[in-house]
A protein has these predicted regions:
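Extreme N-terminal starter segment of soluble prokaryotic enzymes
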Residues: 1-3
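Acetyl-CoA-dependent GNAT
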Residues: 5-11, 15-93, 104-106, 110, ...
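Active-site acidic-Proline motif in GNAT/NAT acetyltransferases
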Residues: 91-97, 125
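Short polybasic/polar patches that bind polyanions
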Residues: 95, 112, 134
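Residues forming the Rossmann-fold NAD(P)(H) cofactor-binding site
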Residues: 101
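Conserved GNAT acetyl-CoA-binding A-motif
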Residues: 111-122
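Conserved catalytic-core motifs of GNAT/GCN5-like acyltransferases
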Residues: 120-124, 134, 139-157
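Helix-turn-helix
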Residues: 129
Length: 163
């Protein structure tokens, strides 16, 4: 399994993975309308390009020309000396096989290289992924609700891991 930094030519791969993974990850948490709204607003190619321009680094997990997941992160997010894990998603059928750990490990290495003290993330309060993060050393530090338009909220825990 290779983990590598994606470039703009691979944003369609990231978008396609998101459209495959999100219904499984959020289908029981979010309404279909909110799911569609978020995919359209966060994973349209112009939105992904803007995220790259804002300093988000995208990683892809690939083996034998098959893509299994992706992550994005931002070192020294908002000048905090901490790295924000913005996204990490793995195809449902490969969860539990170490792909997520490999992606997270690559993010942690980048954070350490940038002399950041922690990695932090937002996770939906009803998402089972919290358990994955807890097993890997993250702790809930607070919760927040983020308005994202059209009356939708992201109801999240903020989790953090010291490096």
């Amino acid at each position: 399994m290779q983990i590598f930094v994606a470039d703009k030519s691979q944003l369609t791969v990231i978008r396609d993975l998101a459209y495959k993974i999100w219904p499984d990850a959020y289908g029981e948490i979010l309404s279909e309308a909110q799911l569609d709204y978020m995919l359209e607003n966060f994973y349209a190619i112009p939105a992904l390009e803007k995220q790259m321009e804002m300093g988000h680094v995208f990683l892809l997990a690939e083996e034998n020309d098959v893509f299994y997941g992706f992550a994005s992160y931002e070192v020294n997010c908002k000048s905090t000396g901490k790295t924000k894990l913005h996204k990490i998603y793995v195809l449902t059928e490969t969860q539990g096989k170490g792909v997520g750990k490999l992606l997270l490990s690559a993010v942690e290495k980048a954070a350490i290289k940038a002399s950041n003290s922690h990695v932090f993330l937002n996770v939906n309060r009803y998402n089972n992924a919290q358990e994955f993060y807890k097993r890997l050393g993250f702790e809930i530090i607070h919760q927040e609700d983020i308005e994202i338009g059209q009356g939708y909220l992201m109801e999240d825990f903020v989790m953090e891991k010291p490096l």
